[in-house]
Amino acid sequence: MAKLSLFERRRRRVRTALKARSGGRPRLSVHRSGRHIYAQIIDDAAGRTLAAASTLVKGDKSIGANVDAAAKVGAEIAEKAKAAGITTVVFDRGGFLFHGRVKALADAAREGGLEF
């Protein structure tokens, strides 16, 4: 049995490739679970989160773990990034395949004005 799962191997491969290409730009990190999707813009040099958005909204049961919710999170993170003065980021899919909810979030963030 392998010491690392396929997901962990993919996550490490993606993260090392990002470090090589980032060029000091903040990264847009995506995490998805069965119920929610989360996005953060992180400045790795300072170790700070510059902006964050997720489907965790109190009282709103309509938003969940579907493609539409991911698109809303992508638009929200792009809006918060603009407010913080961030225009270019490096997309960190975090080992998740670029398909479905992750792709919807990325497309909405691009439409909102983020470049990656």
Swiss-Prot record:
Keywords: Ribonucleoprotein, Ribosomal protein, RNA-binding, rRNA-binding. This is Large ribosomal subunit protein uL18. Part of the 50S ribosomal subunit; part of the 5S rRNA/L5/L18/L25 subcomplex. Contacts the 5S and 23S rRNAs. One of its GO terms (biological process) is translation. The keyword Ribosomal protein applies. GO terms for cellular component: cytoplasm; ribonucleoprotein complex; ribosome. Belongs to the universal ribosomal protein uL18 family. Pfam families: Ribosomal_L18p. GO terms for molecular function: 5S rRNA binding; structural constituent of ribosome. The keyword ATP-binding does not apply. It comes from the Bacteria. This is one of the proteins that bind and probably mediate the attachment of the 5S RNA into the large ribosomal subunit, where it forms part of the central protuberance.
